[in-house]
Amino acid sequence: MGSSDSSSGSAPPRHQPPPPQQGSAPELPPGFRFHPTDEELVVHYLKKKAAKVPLPVTIIAEVDLYKFDPWELPEKATFGEQEWYFFSPRDRKYPNGARPNRAATSGYWKATGTDKPILASGCGREKVGVKXALVFYRGKPPKGLKTNWIMHEYRLTDASSSAATSRPPPVTGGSRAASLRLDDWVLCRIYKKINKAAAADQQRSMECEDSVEDAVTAYPPYATACMTGEGAHGSNYASLLHHQDSHEDNFLDGLLTAEDAGLSAGATSLSHLAAAARGSPAPTKQFLAPSSSTQFNWLDASTVGILPHARNFPGFNRSRNVGNMSLSSTADMAGAGTCAVDNGGGNAMNVMPPFMNHLPVQDGTYHQQHVILGAPLAPEATGAAASAFQHPVQISGVNWNP
C-alpha cells in the first residue's frame, strides 16, 4: 500500500527522444549545411565515436574506405553533396609495423606533405588531433596515375590513443585481422578537386552555347525562312536561291528599262537640239554642258550649248582611215543628231549615236579623243581643254556667225 502511495506521489518520468537510428539521413532545416571545422570534427565527432558516446546527430556513415574506390563512396555516404564524411578503421600494412595500409580496389592512397596538428580553441591551445592529406592514384605504386580525388584523414593524439597505435598488439590466439588493426576509427573527408582550367573551359563553352541560343532566338525569321523553303522546295537553300534569282531578274529588268529610256531621251534631245539650232542660233560659242541632274539624259535642249567652230591644229589630220572605213570629222549631220560615215564606196549612211562620247579611234601618233561634259568650264580650264587633241564636229545648216 505504501509502495503504491509512494509510487503514485512520485513525478511521472520525462519522455526522452529515442536515439537516432544508425544509417538514417538527418533532416536539416533549409539553408543549413554540414560543414564543420577541423576542431569540431575531432572534438565533437571523432572523440565521441572512439569513446562510444552517442553523437549529436547521425550524419557520418561507417564505411571501410579501403575496400572501395573513391568514386564509389558518395553513394554510400549518409549526407553530403560536394564532400562526404566517413568513419573508417585503419589497418597496418605489416603485422609488426606501424605503417598504415593505403591500398584500395583499383589503386592506392598516397600521403602528401606532413601531418598538421589540430589545436583546440581554448586558452591552453592543446593538441587534440592530427590531419593528413592523401591523393588517390590509379594502378599500382610507384607508377600510379594521379587523380583528382582527395582525402583528409583525422586522427586522435591523446595518450591512450598514441600508446595504442605506437606499438603493435601482441599476437595471441586472436584472428589476423585483429593483429593488423591500427586504429579502430579515423574520420575521413572525401571530395573531388575541380581543375580550374577545365572549369574555365567548361564555363566558356556554356557561354558560347548560350550566345548561339540567344542569336537564334533574336533572329527567328531566318529559321522560319529555312523551314518554309524546306517544305516548299525540298531543300533549306531553295528559298534563298529563289529570292536571289528574283532579285537578279528585277535588277536586269530595271537596268534595261532605264537604258531604253535613256536612248529615247537622247534621240528626243537631239531632235530638240537641231530644231533649236535652226530656229535661233546662239550668239556665243560654248562647249557642251549637259544637265548633271537628269539620269541617262546626255543631251538636254535646255542645258546644252552650241558646238564651237572647228579649230585647225598644226600637223593634225582630221580624216583618218581605219580598216575599210573613212571617218571624217567634218561630216555633215543631215537631220537631227545624225553623222555621215563614208564606208569607202562613196555611199554615206546616217548613223544615230546612242551617246555623244562615242568610242574614239586611236592610232600610234595622237592621243585618245576626249569629250568635255559636265558643268561650264572655268576660263583658265578652257584654254587647256581647247589645246587637247579633240575632233571638232560641224553641224550643217547651222549659222555659227550671226
From Swiss-Prot:
SUPFAM superfamilies: NAC domain
Region (Disordered): 1-33
Cited PROSITE patterns: NAC
S-S bridge residues: none
GO biological process: regulation of DNA-templated transcription; system development
Biased segments, Low complexity type: 1-13
NAC domain segment(s): 28-193
Cellular compartments annotated: Nucleus
Lipid biosynthesis in keyword set: no
Residue ranges: DNA binding: 128-199
Main location per the UniProt record: nucleus
Pfam families: NAM (PF02365)
InterPro entries: NAC-dom, NAC_dom_sf
Keyword Secreted: no
Gene Ontology cellular component list: nucleus
GO molecular-function term, one example from the UniProt record: DNA binding
Keywords recorded for this protein, A-Z: DNA-binding, Nucleus, Transcription, Transcription regulation
Note: High grain protein content (GPC) is a desirable trait in breadmaking and pasta wheat varieties because of its positive effects on quality and nutritional value while Low GPC is a desirable trait for barley malt and beer production.
UniProt free text on domains: The NAC domain includes a DNA-binding domain and a dimerization domain.
Role: Transcription factor of the NAC family associated with the grain protein content (GPC). Accelerates senescence and increases nutrient remobilization from leaves to developing grains. Sequences of 11 European varieties of H.vulgare tested belongs to the same haplotype while the sequence found in H.spontaneum, an ancestor of the cultivated H.vulgare which has a higher GPC, belongs to an other haplotype.
Protein's UniProt name: NAC transcription factor NAM-2
Annotated gene: NAM-2
